[in-house]
Amino acid sequence: MALSGVYDLFNDKWCNQTVWIFSDTHFGDTDIKKVCPNRPSDEELVKNINSKVGRKDTLILLGDIGDIEYAKQLRGYKVLIAGNHDAGMSNYSDVFKEVYSGALIIGEKLILSHEPVEIPWMFNIHGHDHAGAKRKNHLNVCADAIGYFPINLNQYLKTGILSKVESIHRLTIDKATERKNKRMKKR
């Protein structure tokens, strides 16, 4: 399942497959407890993830994985969008079926990334922000922001969240209308 495969997960033919999304496991990082003192152990984090993700499910991790040995224990078809702490980790392709070094755009309104991305006509699912700051048209799936369990992406998208995002076409028309109205007022 290549890039088109990840995109296909969101089409009707994949509706029986569950897609989970999560970020910032930081496996093996002893300093993370200084930032997030209530964080569970690496072993507990693996258990939390595997308690949700089945062997036939897809798990999309949005970066900052850490120790690859823990990632090997995770279930499912694993996809990685690398984060800022994943630089130089060449062995990720041994564990993940798909590895992306940058953001992944899915359809016209959804972008998956490690760090938050501000694109007015897209909904951004990201990690990186351990404090869990709220942003319009964003979902932060950083482990520390969502209670250390992955989110069922299928169920989340079924809430209609993408329908609340204005399309680039609507934004373009609105901007053009606004400019026209300003010109008319000046006359």
Where are these regions (language model features)?
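N-terminal active-site segment of His-dependent metallophosphoesterases
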Residues: 1-70, 159, 170-183
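A general structural motif
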Residues: 16, 56, 75-77, 121
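Hydrophobic "anchor" residues on beta-strands that sit immediately upstream
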Residues: 20, 60, 79, 123-124
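Active-site flanking residues adjacent to catalytic metal/cofactor-binding acidic residues
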Residues: 23, 62-64, 83, 113, ...
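Helix-adjacent hinge/juxtasegments
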Residues: 61-101
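Conserved beta-sheet core of the metallophosphoesterase superfamily
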Residues: 87-178
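Long, low-complexity, intrinsically disordered segments
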Residues: 185-187
